[in-house]
Amino acid sequence: MSLGEFAQSRSLTLGVELELQIVNTHDYDLAPSAVDLLRLMERHKVPGSVVPEMTDSMIELSTGICTDYDDALSQLREIRDALVSCAAQLNVGLCGGGTHPFQDWSQRRIFNKPRFQELSQLYGYLSKQFTIFGQHVHVGCPGPDQALVLLHGLSRFIPHLIALSASSPFVQGTDTGFDSARLNSVFAFPMSGRAPFVQTWDDFNVYFNKMTRTGVIKSMKDFYWDIRPKPEYGTIEVRVLDTPLTVEKAAAMAGYIQCLARWLRVEKPFELNEDDYLPYTYNRFQACRFGLDGIFVDPQTGEHRTLRDDILASFDKLELHAMELRAEGAINYLRADLLRIGNDASWIRHINDEEHLLAEVVRQQCQRWAGQGR
């Protein structure tokens, strides 16, 4: 089986996907209302799409192609407003967050769609435990070789993206000690982790054909890599972010990734080397476990810094690129948010410390998603 052609795509355009929680407004547990919500959304003409996800207590929204941060924010707000209106008609709530803090995974139902049913047969209980919620960001690439170079360049910022977006400290009613517990569920899948270190599309085709011949995978969808090429869109897809609590944060994360991509493309700050991946798993664990307080090991120098400090330093490096991309608002939002509260995991823990009730935490998450909370 061949990968086929890598589609033409305008460089540095964006696409944003968000997986959302559907909760009831009685006790704020997950609600199996995806079918009804999708039916109501058919009456709304919005950019992008809203589609089912693995279980019937979640949905995925996607923007259309976005030129910049403001475009992404505008599209996300328009889709958000339509979804909130439809949810109100069903007396359910919608919220961000990488995990629902107290849902019982065994009560989940797989959405009635052939691919989801097939995955359920293959992965068993892991499929129901995959009721987790992430943000994916697509970045347009002018060609396949450039896409792979960008993929490997962005890989050193995977811990930064995890720490900034982390919003999943609670699982099954328990504080896990992780800022992003969601990714622990992803790591359970056999094709998760990082992409192989190949830098040309021809070499990637060779790898892909070897994998399909083994019967381990059938298509690119079977790879759950942190970043993967998306040839049919002409993009790379960054997949490690927890779903933020607001569309503003989601758009800002997309803007940050766009700025990093331009910085890597224009300044070429380092040469790619497979040894750069030596601290990759350690850095990723530090980001998941400790968030912004995690330690980042620079793959070139071996220097140890906190992710908080390295992220703030990256904002300074990206200043001119943010101006060129009209993404200053994204960087300013993330800097202010980092200095004020940290990340969404910190906010969730703070509200739980105040309220001592996870249902109230979810209620306030719904308010924030609707643009009404603190």
From Swiss-Prot:
Its EC number is 6.3.2.2. ATP-dependent carboxylate-amine ligase which exhibits weak glutamate--cysteine ligase activity. This is Putative glutamate--cysteine ligase 2. Disulfide bonds: none annotated. Coiled coil: none annotated. GO terms for molecular function: ATP binding; glutamate-cysteine ligase activity. It catalyses: L-cysteine + L-glutamate + ATP = gamma-L-glutamyl-L-cysteine + ADP + phosphate + H(+). Belongs to the glutamate--cysteine ligase type 2 family. YbdK subfamily. GO terms for biological process: modified amino acid biosynthetic process. InterPro entries: GCL_type2/YbdK_subfam, GCS2, Gln_synth/guanido_kin_cat_dom, YbdK. Pfam families: GCS2. Keywords: ATP-binding, Ligase, Nucleotide-binding. Transmembrane segments: none annotated. The keyword Transmembrane helix does not apply.
